C-alpha cells in the first residue's frame, strides 16, 4: 500500500477571516425572533483535525448527476448517483484479508431503459392534448410545452433523460435481511424503492410514481372531496397542474416507529413501520407508511398528502424530537426563495408520537437564497439539561442553523447564520449524527468542519478548513458524505486546474479520508452504547488498519478491553476481542505477492539460457532455489527503497528463512490461534444458553422442536472445566420438561442418528457430513442455506412450520461478528 498522505489542519491553514453571525432567538411555537448574544465562531487550536487518505480511490464509469450525488447508509453502503446508474460501494471490514486497503464490495443499480410518463389522464386524451399544445400558435404554450422535459421525457431530438436525481437510504432493519432500503429518484421523475437481497443484484420492489399517479387518477386529481371539480386537461394550466402535483423533488425516510395491529382474535401486536416523505413540485408532500419488513406493494399501509403552502420547494428533512419519553415529529421544508419551516405530521396509530399544533417558522425572509440541503441532528443541551434538535441548512455560501428545545414556555427557537465559510456556493453538506459535527464543501476542493459548542443561551460553531489539495492534489469536489460513526468522509472528486488550465477529460472518483484517529475510534468502540460491531464498521476498520500496520495490538486497548470483559461480561466485548485477535493473526501472515510473482530481468535471462538443461536435476533445483532467494532478496530491497517495508517489530515476521526465526513465529501464531478458538468457544456457549432459554420459554412438556435441545445440553455439560451456574440451572429445568426424551436428529440420506459432538457440523455413522446452523444449531440438510457477511457462520432458511420464536432466532445476526446473514 502507498504511504498515506496526511494534512494537518489548524489556524494557519485558514484562508478567510473569522466569520461573523447574525443571530435571533424566539420562544413559543410561533418561532418569533428576538435579539440574542453575538457569537463569533472561528478556527481554534483546540480542535485540530488530522486528515489521512485511504486507498483505494474508486473510479466511476459515468459522470455524477443530481444535486446531492453522495449518500452513506447506516449499514455502511455509499450510493453515488451517476448519469447511467447508481454505484453502490459497501465498506466491509474483512477479518480474513491481510491487506491494509479498504475492502469495498461494489454493485450497481441500473437506470430504467424506458422513460417515465406521469399519468395525467387517459392515454388517448393525453396524446391529443400533447399534439394540441405542440401545434399551438401561442408561443407561451408551444415553447413552454416543447422545452419542458417533464412533459417530454423522451426528448424527441434531444437525448433521453437518463440518470438519477437523488437517492435516500432508509434506517437499518427495513428489508427482508434487516438492512437498508434505497429510494431512488431518476432524472425523468420515476421514484422507486430498491433492495439488495442477495448481495449481487438489486431488485426494484415498487414504483411509487406509478402507484401515486393511479391514486390521483382515481380521485380525479383532487386531494379532498371539498376541492373544486377537476378542470379540462385541454387547458394548459390544468395540464401543468397535474404534472406539478406528482413531480418529485426530494424524498426522505423517517426513523422506524411502532404501530399496533389488531389480530383476528382482537389481540393487538406491535408492528414496525417506516415513513417515506416525498416532496412534490407544487409543494405537496406525500407521506407513505410501510410495514416492515418491506417486501413490495403489499407492504404499503397508507399514503396521506399534506399541503405545505411553500412555493418552489427545494428540499425536506424529517424532524424527530424526544422529550420526557414523548416523541414528536414533523417535516422541515425549505424553499428556493429562502423560507424554512416545520410542518406537523399526524402519525395515526403510532405509539408514543405527538404532533405539533401548528407549523413552526424557522426562517421567513424571502431573501432569494435557495435552500440546497437540510440536516437535523438530535443533541443533548448541557446547560438546559434536556434534549434538543440542531437543524442546519446550506443556503448559498452560508450555513443557516436553528436550535430547537422544549421548555415550560413551549418550543424555543434560536436561529442564526454562519458566514465566511466558503467563497463559492456550498455544493454538498453532511452531518455526523453522533456529535452534531457538520461538514460542508464547495466546488473548489475546500471542506469545512463545523463543531457546535453550546453556550448558556444557544450555541456557536468552531470551524476548521480541510484543503483537499494538500491530500489529493488539485481537485474539484462534487459531493461529500460522512460515515455513520464519523470515522470516514467520502468525497467525489475530479481533476482540478493544472497550470491554469482545465483538464480535457473528467475522471470522477470516490475518495476516502479519515476523520478520527485510532485512539478515538478505540475509545468510542469501548464506550459504545450500540454494542454491535457491524453497525460500527467504519470504526473497527480504523482499528484493523492500525493493527495491520503495526503488527500488534496496543497495550492500552488490551488492558481496557480486559477490564470491560471482567466488569460486565457482555458478549459484545468478547466479539471485539475476537476481532482484534483475528486481525493480529492476519498481520502475522506473510504475503509474498510482491516478492515472488515479479521476476527480475536477470533471472529471466538465466532461465532462458539454462532451459535446455546441462547437468543433473539436483543442480537445476539448486540453481532455481538460489534464483528464487535472489528474487525475494531483491524484491525486499526494492520495497525498502520505496518505503513500503517498515522496521520489523517484535511481533512482525522474520525476513530470513532460518529455522531458528521460524519456530518462535510459529509458536506465536499457534498461541493466537488458541486464543481465537477459546473466544469462539465462549461465544458459542453463550449463544447456546440463549437458544436453550428460548426453548425453555416457548415449549411445553416433552415437545419436539427442530432445535437439538438434548444435544445442546450434553455439549455444554461435556466439558468438566466449564462451570456456569446459569447453564446448569437452565439445563436442569429443560431436562425436567423433556422427561427423558431425547428427540435426536436423523440424517436425511440414511436415516441414521446425527450425534451432537461438534458445534460446526454433524456426521452420521455412515460418514454423511452436514453443516450446523449457528443460530439454532440444527443440521442444515439441504443445498441452500444462508451465510453471514464475513463468512463466519451459516444459517438455515426459515421453514413455514417454524414457530415465531424460531423465526426470530433465525433473524439474529452472526454470533461472532454481528454481521447480517444472507
From Swiss-Prot:
One record GO biological process: transcription by RNA polymerase III
Single GO MF annotation: RNA polymerase III general transcription initiation factor activity
Residues that bear Phosphoserine: 19, 604, 611, 652
Site of covalent link Glycyl lysine isopeptide (Lys-Gly) (interchain with G-Cter in SUMO2): 225, 629
EC number: 2.3.1.48
Keywords: Acetylation, Acyltransferase, DNA-binding, Isopeptide bond, Nucleus, Phosphoprotein, Transcription, Transferase, Ubl conjugation
Single GO cellular component term: transcription factor TFIIIC complex
Catalytic activity field: L-lysyl-[protein] + acetyl-CoA = N(6)-acetyl-L-lysyl-[protein] + CoA + H(+)
InterPro entries: DUF5921, GTF3C4, TFIIIC_delta_N, TFIIIC_Znf, WD40_repeat_dom_sf
Post-translational modification N-acetylmethionine, affected residues: 1
Main EC class the enzyme belongs to: transferase
Cysteine-cysteine disulfides: none
Record localization: Nucleus
Residue span of region Disordered: 1-41, 608-663
Broad class of where this protein is predominantly found: nucleus
Role played: Essential for RNA polymerase III to make a number of small nuclear and cytoplasmic RNAs, including 5S RNA, tRNA, and adenovirus-associated (VA) RNA of both cellular and viral origin. Has histone acetyltransferase activity (HAT) with unique specificity for free and nucleosomal H3. May cooperate with GTF3C5 in facilitating the recruitment of TFIIIB and RNA polymerase through direct interactions with BRF1, POLR3C and POLR3F. May be localized close to the A box.
Subunit structure: Part of the TFIIIC subcomplex TFIIIC2, consisting of six subunits, GTF3C1, GTF3C2, GTF3C3, GTF3C4, GTF3C5 and GTF3C6. Interacts with BRF1, GTF3C1, GTF3C2, GTF3C5, GTF3C6, POLR3C and POLR3F.
Family: Belongs to the TFIIIC subunit 4 family.
Protein name (record): General transcription factor 3C polypeptide 4
Source organism of the structure: Homo sapiens (Human)
Lineage: Eukaryota, Metazoa, Chordata, Craniata, Vertebrata
Gene: GTF3C4
Amino acid at each position: 500500500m502507498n504511504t498515506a498522505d496526511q494534512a494537518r489542519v489548524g489556524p494557519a491553514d485558514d484562508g478567510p477571516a473569522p466569520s461573523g453571525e447574525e443571530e435571533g432567538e424566539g420562544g413559543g411555537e410561533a418561532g418569533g425572533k428576538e435579539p440574542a448574544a453575538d457569537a463569533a465562531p472561528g478556527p481554534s487550536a483546540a480542535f485540530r483535525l488530522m486528515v489521512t487518505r485511504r486507498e483505494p480511490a474508486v473510479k466511476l464509469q459515468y459522470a455524477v448527476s443530481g444535486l446531492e450525488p453522495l449518500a452513506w447508509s447506516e449499514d455502511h453502503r455509499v450510493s453515488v448517483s451517476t448519469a447511467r446508474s447508481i454505484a453502490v460501494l459497501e465498506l466491509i471490514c474483512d477479518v480474513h484479508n491481510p491487506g491494509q486497503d479498504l475492502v469495498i464490495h461494489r454493485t450497481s443499480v441500473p437506470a430504467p431503459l424506458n422513460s417515465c410518463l406521469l399519468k395525467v389522464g387517459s392515454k388517448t386524451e393525453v396524446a391529443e392534448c400533447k399534439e394540441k399544445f405542440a401545434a399551438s400558435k401561442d408561443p407561451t404554450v408551444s415553447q413552454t410545452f416543447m422545452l419542458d422535459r417533464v412533459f417530454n421525457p423522451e426528448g424527441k431530438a434531444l437525448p433521453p433523460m437518463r440518470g438519477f436525481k437523488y437517492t435516500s437510504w432508509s434506517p437499518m432493519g427495513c428489508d427482508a435481511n434487516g438492512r437498508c432500503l434505497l429510494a431512488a429518484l431518476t432524472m425523468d421523475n420515476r421514484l422507486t424503492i430498491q433492495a439488495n437481497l442477495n448481495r449481487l443484484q438489486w431488485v426494484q420492489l415498487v414504483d411509487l410514481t406509478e402507484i401515486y399517479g393511479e391514486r390521483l387518477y382515481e380521485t380525479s386529481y383532487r386531494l379532498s372531496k371539498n376541492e373544486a371539480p377537476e378542470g379540462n386537461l385541454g387547458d394548459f394550466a390544468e395540464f401543468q397542474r397535474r404534472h406539478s402535483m406528482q413531480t418529485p423533488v426530494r424524498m426522505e425516510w423517517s426513523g422506524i416507529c411502532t404501530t399496533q395491529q389488531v389480530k383476528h382474535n382482537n389481540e393487538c401486536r406491535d408492528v414496525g413501520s417506516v415513513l417515506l416523505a416525498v416532496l412534490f413540485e407544487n409543494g405537496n408532500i406525500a407521506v407513505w407508511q410501510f410495514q416492515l419488513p418491506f417486501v413490495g406493494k403489499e407492504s404499503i399501509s397508507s399514503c396521506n398528502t399534506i399541503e405545505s403552502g411553500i412555493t418552489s420547494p427545494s428540499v425536506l428533512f424529517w424532524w424527530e424530537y424526544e422529550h420526557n419519553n414523548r416523541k414528536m415529529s414533523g417535516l422541515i421544508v425549505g424553499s428556493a426563495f429562502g423560507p424554512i419551516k416545520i410542518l406537523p405530521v399526524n402519525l395515526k396509530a403510532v405509539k408514543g408520537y405527538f404532533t405539533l399544533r401548528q407549523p413552526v417558522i424557522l426562517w421567513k425572509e424571502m431573501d432569494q437564497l435557495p435552500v440546497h440541503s437540510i440536516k437535523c441532528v438530535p443533541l443533548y443541551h448541557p446547560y438546559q439539561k434536556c434534549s434538543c434538535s440542531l437543524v442546519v441548512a446550506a443556503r448559498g455560501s452560508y450555513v443557516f442553523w436553528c436550535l430547537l428545545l422544549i421548555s415550560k414556555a413551549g418550543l424555543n427557537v434560536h436561529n442564526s447564520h454562519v458566514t465566511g465559510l466558503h467563497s463559492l456556493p456550498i455544493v454538498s453538506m453532511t452531518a455526523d449524527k453522533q456529535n452534531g459535527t457538520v461538514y460542508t464543501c464547495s466546488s473548489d476542493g475546500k471542506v469545512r468542519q463545523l463543531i457546535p459548542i453550546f453556550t448558556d443561551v444557544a450555541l456557536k460553531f468552531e470551524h476548521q478548513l480541510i484543503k483537499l489539495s494538500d491530500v489529493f492534489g488539485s481537485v474539484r469536489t462534487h459531493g461529500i458524505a460522512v460515515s455513520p460513526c464519523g470515522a470516514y468522509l467520502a468525497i467525489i472528486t475530479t481533476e482540478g486546474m493544472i497550470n491554469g488550465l482545465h483538464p480535457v477529460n473528467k475522471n470522477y472518483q470516490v475518495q476516502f479520508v479519515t476523520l478520527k484517529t485510532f485512539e478515538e475510534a478505540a475509545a468510542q468502540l469501548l464506550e459504545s452504547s450500540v454494542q454491535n460491531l457491524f453497525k460500527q464498521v467504519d470504526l473497527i476498520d480504523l482499528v484493523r488498519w492500525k493493527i495491520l500496520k503495526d503488527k500488534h495490538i496496543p497495550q492500552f486497548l488490551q488492558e481496557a478491553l480486559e477490564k470491560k470483559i471482567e466488569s460486565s461480561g457482555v458478549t459484545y466485548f468478547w466479539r471485539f476481542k475476537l476481532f482484534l485477535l483475528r486481525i493480529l493473526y492476519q498481520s502475522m501472515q506473510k504475503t509474498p505477492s510482491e516478492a515472488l510473482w515479479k521476476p527480475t530481468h536477470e533471472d529471466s535471462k538465466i532461465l532462458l539460457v539454462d532451459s535446455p538443461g546441462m547437468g543433473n536435476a539436483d543442480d537445476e533445483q539448486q540453481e532455481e532455489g538460489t534464483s528464487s532467494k535472489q528474487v525475494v532478496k531483491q524484491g525486499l530491497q526494492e520495497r525498502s527503497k520505496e518505503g513500503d517495508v517498515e522496521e520489523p517489530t517484535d511481533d512482525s515476521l522474520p525476513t530470513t528463512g532460518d529455522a531458528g526465526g521460524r519456530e518462535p513465529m510459529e509458536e506465536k501464531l499457534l498461541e493466537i490461534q488458541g486464543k481465537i478458538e477459546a473466544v469462539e468457544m465462549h461465544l458459542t456457549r453463550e449463544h447456546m444458553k440463549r437458544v436453550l432459554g428460548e426453548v425453555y420459554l416457548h415449549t411445553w412438556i416433552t415437545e419436539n422442536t427442530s432445535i437439538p435441545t438434548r444435544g445442546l445440553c450434553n455439549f455444554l455439560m461435556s466439558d468438566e472445566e466449564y462451570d456456569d451456574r446459569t447453564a446448569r440451572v437452565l439445563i436442569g429445568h429443560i431436562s425436567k420438561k423433556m422427561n427423558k426424551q431425547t428427540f435426536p436428529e436423523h440424517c436425511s440420506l440414511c436415516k441414521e442418528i446425527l450425534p451432537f459432538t461438534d458445534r460446526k457440523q454433524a456426521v452420521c455413522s455412515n460418514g454423511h457430513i452436514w453443516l450446523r446452523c449457528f443460530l439454532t444449531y440444527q443440521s442444515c440438510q439441504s443445498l441452500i442455506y444462508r451465510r453471514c457477511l464475513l463468512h463466519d457462520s451459516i444459517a438455515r432458511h426459515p421453514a413455514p412450520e417454524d414457530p415465531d420464536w424460531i423465526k426470530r432466532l433465525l433473524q439474529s445476526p452472526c454470533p461472532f461478528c454481528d454481521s447480517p446473514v444472507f
